[in-house]
């Protein structure tokens, strides 16, 4: 199954580019529409919360990724994804339902991984994401995201969560003003 969002710009040979890998799930590399235009790649992070005394699992952005490679990840955005039908047949419906605050793409990838399938991103196949007035791609992401800004932003995301950083003016100010502010706000 090839799924492509209606706000993506992709090459005419997108199917061939993804199909050549012959893997369970593979997505073209896309970036978020809104700044900071992060790559839509995720790694699952698991740990133990000593205060709540329970295990936790969450998806974290993969900010630094190998370029021009087929990269195994834990989840991808479904802006442009090719899924082998054996994956769909192996997963129990509902395929894309979640109440955890994550999107249907992450939910599906978690189910696929739990069923023993692998998820990949083809970072050599970069697609554009329509955003008024431009198309967001790797070039815009790299212009916007110098290494220090990415490190600060990623730290804020880890402390506040993606949704909170996008909507929380304190978190936004922390990212703009530097790492000391992020640390102060986190206390």
Describe the role of every protein-language-model region.
Residues 1-9:
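Short beta-strand-to-loop acidic/aromatic patch adjacent to the donor-nucleotide binding site
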Residues 10-11, 105:
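Amphipathic coiled-coil/heptad-repeat helices and related helical stalk/stem segments
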Residues 11-97:
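Conserved catalytic core of nucleotide-sugar-dependent glycosyltransferases
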Residues 85-86, 90-187:
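C-terminal catalytic/acceptor-binding lobe
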